[in-house]
């Protein structure tokens, strides 16, 4: 039970209706008349589409490097290079000749853990997959305050959701991988007969930019730059970065989350098309 204050300042008790879910209206009285379900449905379809493609791409274990056609393009799903399949580009990050499965499997653990624990993605799949809640002023699906899964709702304080707190640590791995993908973008200027630039080079440059925009706009990065300060004047450099750079990126964090997600898939697909010979990568110079 909580209280509200009237205009006169007198407290007014507010009871809890057993037919209401946490924070939402009665199940039979959803007052929203707009198409509130479009956003969670679109997010659901978008994430399912990416997961389906990423699963295929990670398990195909082939044609992830276009060195066979004179292009130094390495799929971001398979970067850094862990096998001899991409040694012609001059760098191998580990002798994984003993690894019989797709090298994308151990690689994707790190960026996947970063995105799964991301504040924006958490909101997205909580709403679109778990319907918890599906939208503002819309009740959770399948339970009330007294019955069903939500009756014992504990937020992110118990296992497994307490593991979402690793996000602040996975950010450091995300920075490393952003650096690796930047290296790949630079390497994409190398051709078998010298320095040049192809359409794939441009795709990898955009990929690195979007990854950095998403990573540096992360809430954990924003806290790292501006958190723990009693006054900003004591750390003017951190305050400048926090206010003029990280916060600006954070304001568009949702946009960069989606753009970087699908551009990674696009970069992988383009590399696969070039490596298989399905298309010719046009060279600008």
Q: Which residues make up each language-model segment?
A:
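Membrane-embedded alpha-helical bundles that constitute the cytochrome b-like, heme-associated redox core
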Residues: 2-285
